């Protein structure tokens, strides 16, 4: 996986210099783009955990979610970085993908929240193409990747897999 955008280093993490529209367009038009939504908590956790930092830094896009991250980018690197709000990015990408019939799969969260979210998305965006979802119980990282759930996800071949585990 290669970073596809310019980035700046904040603490130990490389944060993409981007905006909501640019990220949404990449997510809709490119395949296998790993994207992290990074707020201040993410950066602190990455600073303390070298393995987590290595994983996040390997992603193609690391969005500056949260005012402190965007502001740090502006101050430290004299750029015009704006906040790339994860929720707004999610909605913009859903909306932008309607014309292209982009398919979505949701992984994480809990059953009740996910069903309510899907219901709301179907009202807001008629024609949204949701292939499925899986809400794992609290498990260790190896259990999260149990073969049956991975196979289900791979069989459906969604264009975008939205992951919410934290």
Predicted regions and their residues:
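Short beta-strand segments
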Residues: 37-39, 107-108, 164
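Conserved acidic residues
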Residues: 60, 131, 159
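Proline-aspartate-enriched helix->loop->beta-strand connector
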Residues: 153, 157-166
